[in-house]
Curated annotation (Swiss-Prot):
A single BP term in Gene Ontology: mitochondrial electron transport, ubiquinol to cytochrome c
Gene Ontology MF term list: metal ion binding; ubiquinol-cytochrome-c reductase activity
Annotated heme b b566 binding sites: 97, 196
Compartments where found: Mitochondrion inner membrane
Other comments on record: Heme 1 (or BL or b562) is low-potential and absorbs at about 562 nm, and heme 2 (or BH or b566) is high-potential and absorbs at about 566 nm.
Chief location: mitochondrion
Full protein name: Cytochrome b
Amino acid sequence: MTIMRKKHPLLKMINHSFIDLPTPSNISSWWNFGSLLGVCLIIQILTGLFLAMHYTSDTTTAFSSVAHICRDVNYGWLIRYLHANGASMFFICLFIHVGRGIYYGSYMLLETWNIGIVLLLTTMATAFVGYVLPWGQMSFWGATVITNLLSAIPYIGNTLVEWIWGGFSVDKATLTRFFAFHFILPFIITALVLVHLLFLHETGSNNPSGLNSNSDKIPFHPYYTIKDLLGVLLLLMVLTILVLFFPDALGDPDNYTPANPLNTPAHXXXXXXXXXXXXXXXXIPNKLGGVXALXLSILILXXXPLLNSSKQHGLMYRPITQVLYWIFXXNLXXXXXXXXXXXXXXXXXXXQIASICYXAIIIIFMPXASMIENSMLKLH
């Protein structure tokens, strides 16, 4: 009798995805972040489920219900801070995962890459509507500012914003629908993750050398199951330290003040989730241009396969593009730091330069460097 995992229809799927999956023998720790993202998603769905059991999505009671979770529910404080800081860990893993994809040329796996972009956008949307739910000052004004970006769309903008709000300002209707969105989106993300994996397993994983690894594959289990387990342990260690020692390090003190439509906070800081994209919006003086840049700063990822002019896969043997890549990464860090600051004159100028560099590196410098490398190596 053959092993059940190879015959049973359900177990067979799991077997081909996590056990007998042929995997390149040389994938580095940068390939751990996919499984870490899966773990983050599971943590977020579980903690979110338990939070939803005690949360009320009504403007009069939302803030109090979060306080009640932290004070009166057994381990409610733990669940709440795991959920809040778990989201931050989710985005850190997400940005590293995308950065790995850019570095090693994984964007050439087109379907996987495009679904990944959709996943990134959906996760950002989920984080945004989730941030509104505690109904603190930052929640309320963040919702007001971000939804107002849509009013820049010509002709239909204002109508669209009021339609999303369900009134003439962010109010009861907005909070209730945002809770509904925040509840359903993670399940949509889970479905997309399955499609993402389905397409990945059509081609198999890329690897650091960028060469075809079909001649040298090893089974996923036990080699990568144990490696993923180590990654998960490290992730949980960082998350635990964050939750138990510095639960509010990534939060905003203003969110401990209940939402007040009559009083604006000193500056609405973008949440960690969207900081990179928000820099583009803040830097451009024109409202419509800023909104367009905000969207394009993420959608430019879709153009990465089109802009690829190199004859090699990945940057392992391409020092010029490597230097550009790390300048790009440092530039993103600068953009994130500048976006978090208040919008003073100095910050705006820095963010403008960072935004110009962001676009220029992707569209102009990287393809040009690839061509130079091709000619230097006589790859015609």
